[in-house]
Amino acid sequence: MKNFTNNGNLGKFSFLLLSISLFVGFYFNETASGIGAKADFYNYWPWVLDLKDNFYIPGTKYGTLHLPLHYMILSKLNLVFTDTYFLRLFFCFISIFVPFLFYLNLKIKFRSTEENKLWLLASLTFLFPSFRYSSIWANGHITALIFFLLSTLFFLKWLEKRNYETLSLNLILQVIFLSLAVYTRQYYALFFIYLMIVYFQKLKLNTFIKLALVILVLSLPGFWIIYSTPSVLKVTFSKELSTSLLINASIMAFYLIPIFACIFINNRKILNNNKKQLLILTFFSILLVSFLSLLFEYNFKIGGGFFLKLSVMIFKNNFLFYLTSIIGFILLSYLSIEDKNNFILIVILLIGFSAYMIFQKYFEPMFFFIFFLIFNSKLAPEFLKNYKNLLYLYIYVFFYFTSAIINDFLSITANL
């Protein structure tokens, strides 16, 4: 068994097996976590058809605030795959690039880590319900994730080479691909805020100005879209900030809890060395959530994340949800203390995803990627030291995936 894992066979086998499971889900028209992606595919298909004869049509004419790039791509694919079944099947094949690109990113970020572990971690992507149904129903989240991971790939290469004096190809490519992600799903524009701060910290002033001009040129179509269709901004911002903070913290806690738990179980020194910090963070997190809960008002039937629905389903109240929000603030604060740029990105994520409807799919598997690829933390390499951590994470995500399938089949949350 030891020789099997050292050769990387287990990780590659998992990748192959789980990619096959995706096509099994395709065969059965899997709609884990609800029929939203399936409904989107058919509801917006007229938009795709009209884009075959028109370069640009705003999505508002078809009842959506999504930006058009994904649907423009589908319209071109439809010229080749005239049957929607085969178009979806081709898109399902393309979606395998998401976990593969995640693996390529991991190879750069964790040079000294066994490739077998990186394959195993990347393969876990196939079990996230949002990834699966988005792949099966040719959803724009997959297109955006591909562009996002291409951007992070060149971002990590740029950081590794430390070429901060010139406008390198890695710099240009990362902003181009992030721009494409934005034109697919507009909330990816939040990452430009983070990147501009990083660029300002690392680049020479003249290089920073040149790059800013490149980004300005890339953003011109976006400004035109906002001018012609101002309502697209509503997708990414709402005045109910207190509600958004609680939901976002709870959703991010969902992905952080198993990682932190595994690390603390296997390395108690990390916990013992930071007891004072954790106690302070716990105290202030409880105070913050206690205050925000007084202003919390949200219809759990239109999103809110796994823990909110679980809280209502089991306890008929929001107490479990508030507890996970507290845990989320504690863990996010811990990451913020590790690195100031972590703090900046976490604030952007907490505040930026302040939509009037917040779904777990906005963070899945994007936040999982962010933790391992973008955050500067000792916890990620610590987690990857032990195969048991990956096993426990697989069990956690598998139960999550299973619960999503059961919920979809029995319509449990839909009938609450």
What are these regions (language model features)?
Residues 29-47, 61-76, 85, 185, ...:
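Extracytoplasmic catalytic/substrate-binding loops of multi-pass membrane glycan-assembly enzymes
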Residues 133-143, 359-360:
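Short acidic/glycine- and proline-prone juxtamembrane loop motifs at membrane-interface regions
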Residues 49, 101, 143-163, 170-178, ...:
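Specific aromatic-rich, kink-prone transmembrane helix
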Residues 122, 168-185, 192-196, 214-220, ...:
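Membrane-interface alpha helices of multi-pass inner-membrane proteins
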Residues 89-112, 150, 154:
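Transmembrane-helix motifs of polytopic, lipid-linked glycan transferases
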Residues 182, 188, 193-306, 399-411:
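Membrane-lumen/periplasm interface segments of specific transmembrane helices
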Residues 9-41, 218-227, 284-294, 350-352, ...:
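Transmembrane signal-anchor helices characteristic of membrane glycosylation enzymes that use polyprenol
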Residues 64, 68, 72, 80-100, ...:
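Loop-to-helix entry region of an early transmembrane alpha helix in multi-pass inner-membrane enzymes
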